[in-house]
Amino acid sequence: MQKLAVFLFAIAAVCIHCEAKYYSTRCDLVRELRKQGFPENQMGDWVCLVENESGRKTDKVGPVNKNGSKDYGLFQINDKYWCSNTRTPGKDCNVTCADLLLDDITKASTCAKKIFKRHNFRAWYGWRNHCDGKTLPDTSNC
């Protein structure tokens, strides 16, 4: 019985990442962001943000922040205000934090755009520290 429990735990641990995606190239990410309706004139900022926040991984969960919150997904969206850590969608983006970890980034994109509309890119420390006022990634060849 104990071996079965260990086996099932191992399968569950692997499957947590079954629906995750890693954008292996910058252009893969750019194509997906275009599909999600991100504006072309902001593409360099969004790519820089994603690369510095999550490393282009949809399943990234950040470490616990000083206030006890965590950041989730491709855009590292915070659970204090934006996503619910329960099975019921909630908070300002009306999503679960698990929704933000899927390879389908539709909900994460919608939430990121909502955050941007309220706070601009300054809502993300990865953007502030690595992108603001710096040379942005060139996405023109994608």
Swiss-Prot record:
Domain of life, per lineage: Eukaryota
An individual GO BP term: killing of cells of another organism
Record keywords: Antimicrobial, Bacteriolytic enzyme, Disulfide bond, Glycosidase, Hydrolase, Signal
Cystine connections: 27-142, 48-131, 83-97, 93-111
GO molecular function: lysozyme activity
SUPFAM superfamilies registered for this protein in UniProt: Lysozyme-like (SSF53955)
Residues at the active site: 53, 71
Signal sequence range: 1-20
EC numbers on record: 3.2.1.17
Catalyzed reactions per annotation: Hydrolysis of (1->4)-beta-linkages between N-acetylmuramic acid and N-acetyl-D-glucosamine residues in a peptidoglycan and between N-acetyl-D-glucosamine residues in chitodextrins
Domain C-type lysozyme as annotated: residue spans: 21-142
Pfam families in UniProt: Lys
Similarity annotation: Belongs to the glycosyl hydrolase 22 family.
Functional description taken from the UniProt entry: Lysozymes have primarily a bacteriolytic function; those in tissues and body fluids are associated with the monocyte-macrophage system and enhance the activity of immunoagents.
Protein name (database record): Lysozyme
Originating organism: Hyphantria cunea
